[in-house]
A protein has these predicted regions:
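Transmembrane beta-barrel architecture of outer-membrane proteins
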Residues: 20, 88, 147, 180-182, ...
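Transmembrane beta-barrel strands of outer-membrane/channel proteins
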Residues: 106, 133-137, 148-150, 164-170, ...
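Outer-membrane beta-barrel domain signature
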Residues: 11, 79, 137-143, 172-176, ...
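Transmembrane beta-strand segments of outer-membrane beta-barrel domains in Gram-negative
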Residues: 195-357, 414-415
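Periplasmic polypeptide-binding modules associated with outer-membrane biogenesis and secretion
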Residues: 2-139, 168-182, 328, 348
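Outer-envelope beta-barrel architecture signal
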Residues: 100, 116, 127-131, 146-148, ...
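Residue-level signature of outer-membrane beta-barrel architecture
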Residues: 124, 154-156, 189, 231-233, ...
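C-terminal transmembrane beta-barrel domains of outer membrane proteins
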Residues: 314-425
Length: 425
């Protein structure tokens, strides 16, 4: 207000100060804040009426998406309108899953210029098919070091917000002989605004092609079924936290040549073992301008009723009671992008078994868990911890292709307590 301070006439000075303050507020983004002059007291005064967002409306063809976006924007209702902050929030909306495009407008509510209506028009275009194919050399020990992975993801397949994921993997040696194959399908379906359910089925076959002893014809077949429900406890434009609970059922068969053979701890004379467990916990995820993070705390509880009486007896001989198998775990990860070509990734995981666990409940170490430079799975145990950090630099980029240099450092340890003693590695 310095330019108007030297004006001698009180009325002219008041009007000039009001105009200067209005211009400054508008330049700072307070576009519907108004400055009024008052003649009482005689010296006059300036009255500033803050412009606010009085109402938020979201329009579009997808009712579920409209409700979600309105809930995310509802905290704006009643707040002071500042255009740069509002534009930043709208830009974050465009990054949300299911949003193909957004148009935002501000309208006056009635005749009051300080009360604005925010109108968001959403285009919920159907998500396109996404795929990924990669060739790597971090296969599984015994099943070949060369690894091929293929993934297909289709969102909005049956209804808005759902997702179908197809995954395939093969491992071979240099001959090439097929050592491992895996195929899985999973589907996620939203039920309402907060609840979603997921189901998955996977089948795999592992042949120990790299082992000559005790017998090169040892192989395993595994079937896995998973069902899980996620419930969103809270969500903002930058973060989401939710609870989850699921049931996993696993069946593994051991073979010597083409004949079933009891190769598994707990398997009977027919060579197969079925176990299952519940997994439940809390999780959170979020992102900012340069960072993203996620974390979860979970519990595991074995289910005895999924194994046969003979299998329970054999497992009990080794001190494993599926109905008493319990564990607690924690997973954390974070990504920081300090510059356009640089990215720092940190991740850690830990699990503590409260009682001896069945095999599928354990924690594994390998590149599948973030430990680069190792096979997909090297070793597993009931309890364990791991940590890994990597700093990636994009040395060359062209379109969708790029070459990265990724120095990394990682370590882990697992252990299993049985009646015979502790196994660790």
């Amino acid at each position: 207000l310095a330019p108007c301070a030297d004006i001698q006439d009180p009325a002219a000075r008041l009007q000039a100060c009001a105009a200067a303050l209005s211009s400054r507020l508008y330049a700072d983004g307070y576009t519907n804040t108004r400055v009024y002059t008052r003649q009482d007291p005689p010296a006059g005064l300036l009255e500033v009426v803050e412009g606010r967002i009085a109402e938020v409306r979201v329009e579009g063809p997808d009712g579920r998406l409209n409700r979600r976006l309105r809930n995310l924007l509802l905290p704006l209702q009643g707040t002071v309108l500042r255009l740069p902050e509002l534009e930043a929030r709208v830009a974050r909306l465009e990054r949300l899953s299911g949003v193909a495009g957004i148009q935002a407008s501000l309208n006056r509510l009635g005749s009051d210029p300080t009360r604005a209506v925010l109108v968001i028009t959403v285009d919920s275009g159907r998500r396109t098919l996404q795929g990924d194919l990669s060739l790597r050399n971090d296969g599984s020990t015994g099943s070949g070091q060369f690894r091929g992975l293929a993934t297909l993801l289709q969102g909005d397949l049956v209804r808005s917000g759902d997702a179908l994921l197809l995954y395939g993997e093969v491992n071979t040696d240099s001959q090439p002989n097929l050592g491992y194959s895996l195929a899985s399908i999973s589907y996620t379906l939203p039920l309402g605004d907060r609840l979603q359910i997921s189901g998955a089925f996977g089948a795999s076959r592992r042949n120990l092609i790299e082992f000559d002893r005790p017998d090169p014809d040892l192989s395993f077949r595994q079937l896995q079924v998973l069902g899980q429900a996620d419930y969103t406890l809270g969500e903002t434009l930058n973060s989401r936290w939710f609870g989850f609970a699921g049931l996993s059922v696993n069946r593994t068969d051991g073979y010597l040549g083409a004949r079933a053979f009891p190769l598994l701890l707990g398997a009977g004379s027919d060579g197969w073992l079925r176990t299952g467990f519940l997994r439940f916990g809390l999780a959170a995820e979020g992102q900012g301008e340069r960072i993203s993070w996620s974390g979860s705390a979970y519990g595991l509880q074995g289910v005895a009723g999924l194994s046969t009486a003979e299998q329970l007896k054999i497992l009990g001989f080794y001190g494993i009671e599926p109905g008493r198998s319990k564990a607690l775990g924690l997973q954390l990860s974070g990504v920081w992008r300090p510059a356009r070509r640089w990215q720092l990734t940190l991740q850690a995981a830990a699990q503590q078994a409260l009682n001896p666990l069945t095999g599928a409940m354990g924690i594994s170490l390998g590149s599948d868990n973030g430990l680069r430079g190792l096979p997909g799975q090297v070793i597993s145990g009931d309890s364990g911890l791991l940590g890994e950090t990597e700093l990636s630099w994009s040395a060359w980029q062209h379109g969708q292709a790029e070459i990265q240099l990724v120095p990394f450092l990682g370590a882990g340890r697992v252990s299993t307590n049985l009646q015979e003693g502790t196994i660790s590695g």
